[in-house]
């Protein structure tokens, strides 16, 4: 169970961030189940209190086939099946950030269960940014009202009897949040597995220096904290993995072990410069910035996605 954050690292461009000085709770390990989505390399999580059997879902996936334009709930239904099979009660549906590589199933799960949805409060900054890029009408809200709760940095909540808090972790996006629940931290697109480095920071609102500073905050969590990443791309064809430790990240992640802040910023910026845009980014963000809701149906009863043409430079090669 996390007890303290020793130091708070200020992030560039923001006032100093703070997190709870201490957490108290059951002292038991969080019961974490990861379900891997091979199509996007994403991991969706169920984290449960082993005593009360109450749980949260983190980063649920709504399946989308780009060729046919069809959505399916296969991955999200796996979450519901697991929750039912293990006698769990869903208490939270949590997004760590608006994803660029898959659709969020938060809206679907809320409809199916009634559990509240949540994300970091700075999602409103990302909504404003992308409203301009999509040229959306003023009727589209950019106040975060698509979620039931917007977490501030350091804000506490509970999952069953387990104490939890939200840790603002920008860099990949403006509003990325790490959820620390019991002794588990869900670090999304900051740290990947130690053999895979770190997440990109070149999306609109992304910043490599902020990503470095966010990672340093995560690494200052108690040494017993288990780290759960948001993606795994199976380098060299190995089996998918998603759990690591602070010690293994410090010792084996080359983006941390071999870098100080200026070196990391250069490495990350150089790598990002030649990365292709995620296949689903322009489709996914207009859904994910609406809390995992498809656009409102038009007069024929069908929803349509809007793609801004020539809004981003093409990466050649």
Stretch-by-stretch model annotation:
Residues 2-30, 122, 206, 213-226, ...:
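Accessory terminal helices/loops
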Residues 28-89, 178-188:
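Conserved beta-strand hairpin/beta-sheet module of binuclear metal-dependent hydrolase folds
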Residues 31-37, 46, 153-181, 220:
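Core dinuclear metal-dependent hydrolase active-site scaffold
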Residues 40, 63-65, 98-103, 124-127, ...:
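Active-site environment of divalent metal-dependent phosphoester hydrolases
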Residues 58, 89-98, 118-121, 169-171, ...:
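Active-site neighborhood of phospho(di)ester-bond hydrolases with catalytic His/Asp-centered motifs
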Residues 62-162, 251-252:
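Active-site HxH/HxHxD metal-binding segment of metal-dependent hydrolases
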Residues 76-79, 211-215:
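Aromatic/hydrophobic pocket-lining residues that form the small-molecule binding cavity
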Residues 200-206:
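Adenylate-forming
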């Amino acid at each position: 169970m996390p007890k303290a954050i020793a130091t708070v690292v200020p992030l560039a461009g923001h006032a100093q961030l703070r997190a709870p000085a201490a957490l108290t709770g059951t002292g038991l390990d969080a019961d974490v189940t990861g379900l891997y989505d091979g199509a996007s390399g994403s991991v969706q999580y169920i984290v449960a209190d082993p005593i009360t059997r109450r749980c949260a879902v983190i980063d649920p996936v709504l399946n989308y086939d780009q060729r046919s334009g069809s959505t399916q709930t296969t991955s999200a239904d796996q979450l519901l099946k697991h929750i039912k099979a293990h006698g769990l009660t869903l208490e939270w549906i949590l997004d760590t950030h608006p994803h660029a590589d898959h659709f969020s199933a938060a809206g679907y799960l809320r409809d199916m269960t009634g559990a509240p949805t949540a994300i970091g409060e700075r999602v409103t900054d990302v909504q404003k940014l992308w409203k301009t890029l999509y040229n959306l009408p003023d009727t589209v809200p950019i106040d975060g009202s698509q979620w039931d709760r917007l977490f501030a940095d350091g804000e506490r909540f509970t999952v069953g009897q387990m104490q939890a808090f939200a840790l603002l972790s920008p860099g990949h996006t403006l509003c990325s949040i790490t959820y620390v629940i019991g002794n588990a931290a869900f670090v999304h697109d900051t740290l990947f597995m130690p053999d895979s480095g770190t997440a990109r920071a070149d999306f609109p609102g992304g910043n490599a220096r902020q990503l470095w500073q966010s990672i340093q905050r995560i690494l200052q969590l108690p040494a017993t904290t288990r780290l759960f990443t948001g993606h795994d791309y199976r380098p060299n064809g190995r089996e998918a993995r998603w759990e690591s430790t602070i010690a293994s990240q410090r010792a084996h992640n080359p983006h941390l072990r071999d870098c100080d802040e200026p070196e990391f910023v250069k490495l990350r910026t150089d790598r990002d410069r030649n990365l292709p845009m995620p296949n689903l980014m322009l489709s996914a963000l207009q859904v994910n910035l609406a809390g995992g809701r498809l656009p409102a149906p038009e007069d024929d009863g069908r929803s349509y996605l809007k793609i801004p043409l020539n809004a981003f430079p093409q990466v050649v090669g």
